[in-house]
């Protein structure tokens, strides 16, 4: 039978807790600059893996600490790596934290001025292959004992942390590039099932 959209997500899709996220950030201190910037960008903005791979320097504004997400890189065996619009077909401008901006500044200064892409291949100025983060995340998770560490889980984590800290769902939806805020709310609810269950238990015990 077909699962409903509101079916519980498996563990690997749930968000990291605030404590787990802090541990991830500590682990990043030992990682290469490119990956520190990539992972922190995903946590900070909730952007998709392909959107980060498709980010160009012309879309980074250091004066306003914003990025414009206007392309998404995808890969299929038939087409290879190709460029599309973001998933909802719309460009969006997202602000980044001062920590992310500083890492991006450092990354920009480490690259030749002719490089267009923010995240490049190790031996080429071409954009990072969209499958590369998935492989790197697997190694990162094994190295630091983090289960189910993959890019999309950081997207769930970004939404979870934002809403938990008081951001309204409509604003978070716009930041994530969701065309419907109910998608964001489902993501938050699924990512925080354990917390919601504890709230229910607290109410019943009151």
What spans do the regions from the language model cover?
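Basic, Lys/Arg- and aromatic-enriched nucleic-acid-binding interface segment
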Residues: 1-55, 63, 74, 90-91, ...
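Catalytic-site neighborhood detector that most strongly recognizes the C-terminal catalytic loop/helix
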Residues: 7, 73, 125, 176-202
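Short, basic (Lys/Arg/His-rich) helix/loop patches that form interaction surfaces
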Residues: 23-36, 45, 94, 109-127, ...
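DNA/chromatin major-groove-contacting recognition/catalytic segments
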Residues: 24-27, 78-84, 165, 186, ...
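Short, polar N-cap/turn motifs at the start of nucleic acid-interacting alpha helices
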Residues: 59-66, 167-187
């Amino acid at each position: 039978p077909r699962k409903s959209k509101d079916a519980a997500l498996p563990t690997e899709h749930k968000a990291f807790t605030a404590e787990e996220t802090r541990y991830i950030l500590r682990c990043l201190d030992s990682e290469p600059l490119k990956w520190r910037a990539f992972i922190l960008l995903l946590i900070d903005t909730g952007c998709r893996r392909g959107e980060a791979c498709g980010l160009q320097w012309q879309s980074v504004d250091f004066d306003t600490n914003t990025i414009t997400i206007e392309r998404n890189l995808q890969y299929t065996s038939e087409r290879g790596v190709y460029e599309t619009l973001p998933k909802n077909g719309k460009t969006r401008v997202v602000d980044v934290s001062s920590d992310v901006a500083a890492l991006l500044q450092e990354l920009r200064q480490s690259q030749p001025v002719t490089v267009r892409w923010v995240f490049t291949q190790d031996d080429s100025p071409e954009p990072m292959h969209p499958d590369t983060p998935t492989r790197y995340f697997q190694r990162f998770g094994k190295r630091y004992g983090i289960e189910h560490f993959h890019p999309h889980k950081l997207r769930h984590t970004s939404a979870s942390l934002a809403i938990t800290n008081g951001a309204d769902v409509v604003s978070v939806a716009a930041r994530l590039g969701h065309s419907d805020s109910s998608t964001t709310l489902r993501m938050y609810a699924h990512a925080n099932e354990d917390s919601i269950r504890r709230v229910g238990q607290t109410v019943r015990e009151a």
